[in-house]
Amino acid sequence: MSTKLEQLRALTTVVADTGDIEAISKYQPEDATTNPSLILKAAQIAEYAPLIDASIAYAKAQSNDKTQQVADTCDMLAVNIGKEILKVVPGRISTEVDARLSYDTEGSVIKARQLIKMYNDAGITNDRILIKLASTWEGIRAAEVLEKEGINCNLTLLFSFAQARACAEAGVFLISPFVGRIMDWYKAKEGRDFESSEDPGVVSVTGIYDYYKTYGYNTVVMGASFRNIGEILELAGCDRLTISPNLLQELEDATGEVVEKLIDTNGTKERPAAMTHAEFLWEHNQDPMAVEKLADGIRNFAVDQGKLEVMIAERL
């Protein structure tokens, strides 16, 4: 019998959640996703030293100001890692905007355009890139602007139904609803483990997927942040799933039937009126888990971005 990873590929587009090119080459995913934490981790791999050196050289050619050099190096490093990943995946790379811009629509748009220009200057076309933004109201509005410019976006740190609905209404290309981090919160709060089928993260993504398909939204649903393969298999059939190398290996080693759990109903139900800012904030803030995890996620990405900047500054 074929492995569970092979069977999953037949139902869902498998994406690698890593900046490790060796791991990506091994599992042959369609796409790959990175974030500030993964870029920091990748930057500490010895084989990536030439990419850091090239990024520093680029930054020094752009400016004599050290602060600007650090910022430019970080951006170019993310792009350089993305370029290497695109040599081994046929699809797209997701590159994230600085998390400290999560509440700054204009700043996010400017940073996204800069990243896209860096890719374009290296010969990478827009159809191979997704710009990652936090699913704040401001991030969603930035994505709305960028999508109209032909820059596709991946809205991440998505924990509430309100975030998912607002993303669809803004016409974003793809969302990354988090599974494991939702489960973590409920596990800590309730002090118990969950069967995969009743995992709160799985339930959340299933609800979002069904809503999108009922109303005919084209936004791609890509489940993310998995803690075990049970969560992944409960979402078989989802548009895309982004999976860490260790869980890809578990799926590669596992046999047994993979059953399609999420099915596209191709619905055309009349859509509700788009949410206002006030409605979004009210609905999102009714979910204490989502409020806590969104803020926590932004903080943690910002911390890792800061660590990367310190590391780069020491090498300038």
Swiss-Prot record:
Residues annotated as catalytic: 132
GO BP term, example: carbohydrate metabolic process
Keyword field contains Translocase: no
Top-rank lineage group of the source organism: Bacteria
The EC number(s) this enzyme carries: 2.2.1.2
Keywords: Cytoplasm, Pentose shunt, Schiff base, Transferase
GO CC annotations, alphabetized: cytosol
GO molecular function: transaldolase activity
Pfam family, one: TAL_FSA
Substrates-to-products reaction catalysed: D-sedoheptulose 7-phosphate + D-glyceraldehyde 3-phosphate = D-erythrose 4-phosphate + beta-D-fructose 6-phosphate
Pathway noted in the entry: Carbohydrate degradation; pentose phosphate pathway; D-glyceraldehyde 3-phosphate and beta-D-fructose 6-phosphate from D-ribose 5-phosphate and D-xylulose 5-phosphate (non-oxidative stage): step 2/3
InterPro entries per record: Aldolase_TIM (IPR013785), TAL/FSA (IPR001585), Transaldolase_1 (IPR004730), Transaldolase_AS (IPR018225)
Gene3D superfamilies: Aldolase class I (3.20.20.70)
Predominant cellular place of this UniProt entry's protein: cytoplasm
Disulfide partners: none
Localization per Swiss-Prot or TrEMBL: Cytoplasm
Assembly mode: Homodimer.
NCBIfam families: PRK12346.1, talAB
Function: Transaldolase is important for the balance of metabolites in the pentose-phosphate pathway.
Protein family membership: Belongs to the transaldolase family. Type 1 subfamily.
Name of the protein in question: Transaldolase
Protein species of origin: Photobacterium profundum (strain SS9)
